[in-house]
Amino acid sequence: MLNAASWSHWRDRANECRDAQRLVPAQSPPLIGRWRISCWARRRLLNEVTELNACELEIDLFCRGLRIPGDVPLDGVRGISRTRAGLGSGLEVILPTGSRIKKEIWTNVPVVESFATESPYRLQGAGDEGFSIVDDRVNHTYPVRLPEEPDWYTRQTSGGTQMNRIGVLQGTCLGIYINPVCTFWNYQPPLNCRFCTTGQNVGASEALEKSVADVVETCRAAKAESGITFVHLNGGFQGSRGIAFALPYVRAIKEHVGLLVGLQLAPERDFSRYDALMSTGVDHVSFCLEFLDPAWFERICPGKARIHGQGLFLEALAYCAARMPSGSVSGEIIAGVEPIERTHEAIDLIAKLGAFPTVCIFRPTLGSDMEDWPSPAYAAMREVMVHVYEACRRHWIPVGLAPRIEVSLVVTPDETALLAPRTAGFYVYEAYLRLAALAARPLFARRLRTVSAHLG
């Protein structure tokens, strides 16, 4: 029951809900003017405040993290993997949605960062009885699943490297850092992006060098045993040799495994190299713009600001988006650092260029230069993700078409449908996405065969 002592708590929680503000003015305790909150309004407020849908819960978990008590057994579940930039350093969790739009959401929940120790969310349960996440503020429970660690993780390649040091699953996708450490880490003083820990992870928790053969064997095992359809390759800044270095990996995976292949590298000034990349059959290209505000871009990404500049990221993105199938290119940005208005502008700009916005909620990763920065607020991040959906809808960006791709590191555009207002435009866009997915099935089936198979 609401009382004056608990009012501040409920008011703050209500401010994070879409509709609660119209029910309970922020300036008033339980007496509003001369009348009390009705039982109906009180129940509505409690429901709005305590029950989040799966996408809202995903956002709040990204912002607040999760506590794992010592008596909760995690035997057999995927371990915490500090690979690549360090963003996947959390616990892999599957959230059922109860929605026909999307059945489940895969998310990588922060658990080791300092802010997670203060999280109101707590994991409970065990493998045999099932797991759930409890919100200790209101004792609300969300049933979840924890994916098992695949057997191939501990298998060795023919080159003698354990496969989980070549690549790891992030959601249902395989992530592999193919290049040596991003060159920005080699400058004195270092010019690395301040949120990144690639320089600490590559060569420590994952292999420093990954041969084409080792990558192919790992991809083949992940496809055969984990059912993956997509592998994401990235490698940071490697001077002018980034795409040239990546081409043999892309070709080998397409020829010998048959997967959808995505590539994320620093932009290059010779755009003909992107034509060479497209000729290999690469399925997805992404560009990490990170921030739209020039001052924040220079402050947080000194190497990118000095060597590339923001303009090159956008020019390369536009070039690829104009030449690849719609929905094949993405622009990646970080929300929760620069002013939210600039994040909205970045989302609109990326969608206007024909790409889909991939928005990462800022995570102050352990070991990074920003590990002591605060995690962003839920309400602002929810607003950002609603904006993602609306931008994709306005520009008819086809999202979520590829089969069996669930990315756990970010809130994906197709997941944001669970946040969107149910307008006529919403239903038209969702119908468009379903028809597009149906039409794209033969294309994806062909791209998931080896090159030799569909040439024959």
Task: Describe the function of each predicted region.
Residues 216, 220-223, 230, 234-376, ...:
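Conserved AdoMet/S-adenosylmethionine-binding subsite of the radical SAM
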Residues 2-6:
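Extreme N-terminal basic, low-complexity initiation segments
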Residues 190-196, 209-211, 246-248:
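"Short basic amphipathic alpha-helical interaction patches in structured regions
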Residues 7-136, 140, 344-456:
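Auxiliary Fe-S-binding modules of radical SAM enzymes
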